[in-house]
Amino acid sequence: MDKPFKNIDEQLDILRSRNLEIDDEKEAREALTIYGYYEIVNGYKSFILESDDSDNFKTGETFSHLYSLYQLDKDIRNGVLRATLEVELSLRTAIAYTIAEDFGEKQTDYLNPRNYRRGHKRQNSNRYPLYQLLDKLNNIANDDIEPYKHYRENHGNIPPWILLKGTSFGNLVNFYKLLKPKQKDKVISICTGLPEQFITDSIKLMFAQALCMIHSYRNRAAHSGRLFSYRSQKIMEYNEPLHEKIMEITREEYNNGVGQTGLFTLQNILSIFKNQRSGFLFEFSVYYSIGYHCQYYPSDLDLLCEQTMINKNDMLRGIEKYSK
């Protein structure tokens, strides 16, 4: 059954009827006008309702509290977008550098399908992923926008560091998957700073899964989905270099859900990249924003630790670091 339209006055009446105190009506009206009832109320009410099967809010709960949860998550989303953009820029540079060095800067050379793996056909598709990717790259090359038009008409060629500017993060992740082992090692080395001779199968698996998880969080943030409680379906399999050496968690802790997904896991996989700005942008958005929110709603700290999967001691250290 479709829900009928409700104006701002009616929206406020609904919230009052459900036991939510409108403690600052001007703020509430502005928030609902700018961001909408669904984004604020439906997105975050579950944390302050009486119970899972009730639409009534806990006694004493306010719109300001609800709105602060929304603003907190919006700040984290913006931070995740900025952090993952840094990863995208690094990955794009690494792939372009690698294929230019190994295959040359001419389109006819670096777009030669022999240089790549075909990948596996997806369900309901009769084409290999490689040819779908090459179609996208050729479409970019033939686009009538700059800088592609300039390079095509004035140089007769678009080098990879220019062509790849037109790719999305998802395109780049797929491109990486279709590289052959030698080129994958180079990309990992450029992105992480780890010498190629030290790149093991475990590190290759970790890097590939990290890209998929980062892409998942990037998409979630870009589409304004609630993020601090998000659990990506793309999980990190137990991996000694990541879980034991970086995250310092045991196999038992992993089996109990720690280090598989969640913001805590995302923070740690961002730390493997040589581009430290991605980690800084992520950590600042999470710890500063949670610290600011908890100045006004300190009882939410345990909730936010649970939802982000960041343990309380790490959370407090992060808040102290980024709140100075």
Language-model regions, residue ranges each:
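Long, contiguous internal "core" modules enriched in hydrophobic/ aromatic residues
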Residues: 1-324
